[in-house]
Each structure stands twice: as C-alpha cells, then as structure tokens.
Amino acid sequence: MKTIKILIIIMIFAIIQMPVFDARAGISVAPDRHIVSLSPGEEMLVKYQVSNVGAKDVNITIAPEAWSGLKDPYDWLALQSDNVYVKAGESSPIVIGVSAPEDAIGEMVAMLFLCYKDTSESQLNIRNGVPLYMIIKGTEDYGLDIDNIEVTYTKNDNNVNDLNIIVDINNTGNVHIVPDVKVFIRNNNGKLLKEASLNRPNIVLRGKKHTYRLGWRNPFFKDGIYTVTAVLDYEDKIESVSKEAQFNVSDNNIEMIPSAKAGN
C-alpha cells in the first residue's frame, strides 16, 4: 500500500509557493506560507515579500496570532518590525526570527495578519493572514483516523439520484497534515465501479477534524450491496489509513449497513 505523503516542502529559509493576492488593495504576499523544521533551541530567519501592485502607497501592520489555540507565537517568533510601508509598484520584506522552545513538542503554528486600509474610497479595514508552521524535529507524531463514512442519494435538478459520499477524518497527531483522500466503490463481486479523489487537498491541523465530500452525478446502481473504501495517504512516516463501509441499494434508496452486519 502507498505510504502516507504530506504535501509540504521544507527548506532552510523559504518554500516556493504561489503568492497571496488581495485585489482590494493591490497587495500580494509570497510565499503564501512558510513551513520550517527546527530542533529544540534552534533558530533561523524567515522572510515574506509584500508587493504593492496598486496605485497608492499602503501602510501595513503585522500582527501574529496563535492558530488553533497553539503556543503563543510571541514565545517563539520575533518580528524585525511590526509595520511596513510599501509604495505603489514596490515591494518590501517582512523578516521574522523564529526559535524553537526547548520544551516545544510537535508543531507551532502562527497566522501572520497583515492589517491595512482599502485604498479605494470605502477605506475599509482589511486583515489578511499568511501562516507560519514550525515543526519541532524529533517530536513529530503523525496520526490519522477515519471516523465515519456515509453514502446517500439526493435528487438533482432532473429528479435523478446523485450519489454523495462523506468521509470524516480526525488528525490525532501533533503536526498538521495535508492528506490525499481517495474513495473506491465496488459491487458485491468486488468489481471496481468508481475511483475518485475527494476535493482538493486541505490542511488539517493537529487535534482537528475535517469532512471530505464526493458527488457522483446520476450513477446507475442495481439493487444489491456495495462497498466503499476510503484511503488516506500522507508522508512516509506511517502506513496508509483505510476504512470500509457497506451500503445497500433497494428501490432507488440507499441504506448504510452497520459495521457488525458488514463483517468489519
């Protein structure tokens, strides 16, 4: 079975990502996130580049906040400056020193909020965030469970049944993950009827849950029992996670089969 792949690229000072762009003020930020890996007590610098592609100068205040109730970011990061003035058509760096606390475990996550005013007549206050992840080397715990699989029918605009698959996952580890979620549907003879990926990759923070959904428009199922298998892949640290569920199709209705009956 494919082993788990987390979709992150760790570099010493930066990772290459598409920039964040806010058309309201003509601001873009690159990269759209940083993911760094440090040993306890280790320090480094990270840099974001803010570009003003608008027609007016912008004054930006940087305000880091803990994300998902994790350690206070001011315990492990220091801004070179909490304010940056960017002239129209120019760019400016945001430099941040990060230091892994000696007692840190798993991962620290901060959201760096860029606060400024809309340069249009509305003068609205704008607050955009870019994340900073710091993984603590040697303390990572990768864990993931599939809590539930559910299959239902819903009527579409043509009054025909569409199939809906819901997979609820739970990050039981202490670092964020970006799982690749796939589902496989087989008939009672084991023939593969459908293979599909669920949504685009989503970041699931430690201790958090996420629901993935798949819609299959106007499938045809004969009456009978079917098996749906969900498979989650991420970094090569643990084996893939999978779970099966069965459902019964009868007279254009779907009923989930309890796991004890399904033999799971």
Each model region followed by its residue ranges:
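Short, solvent-exposed loop/turn segments enriched in Ser/Thr/Gly
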Residues: A30-D32, P40-K47, S92-I94, I105-L112, ...
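Intrinsically disordered, low-complexity Pro/Gly/Ser/Thr-rich segments with frequent PxxP/GP/PP motifs
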Residues: D75-D103, K191-F221
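Asparagine-centered strand-capping/turn motif at beta-strand->loop junctions
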Residues: V50-G54, A100, I169-G173
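Surface-exposed binding patches on compact interaction domains or structured appendages
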Residues: G26-P31, V53-I96, D180-V183, N187-L192
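Terminal connector regions
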Residues: V53-S68, E102-T139, P219-N264
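Beta-sheet-dominated interaction scaffolds and their linkers
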Residues: A23-V53, N83, L144-D162
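C-terminal segment of classical bacterial N-terminal signal peptides
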Residues: F13-D22
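Bacterial N-terminal signal peptides that target proteins for export
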Residues: M1-I8, P19
